[in-house]
């Protein structure tokens, strides 16, 4: 099953997607310039494509994603100011959108 929702964070609009799998859930939040994803996704692919992507793990829903510490980030996300280990998902999205 797939769910979608619109989110607004500090005046910025994002689309959130949740896709159930047989053994878990795939979670993604997408802005106009940013992507926040769960552990199902690959930093290597984001780097190859040049996407601003931050990765959070151990999350079960969109609120968890926004509050979790970023575990890893693509090179373009790092250049936008995302700091794995100290930035939250919410902060990462805003940094990637605002730069």
Language model regions located:
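Residues that scaffold, gate, or flank divalent-cation-dependent active/transport sites
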Residues: 1-99
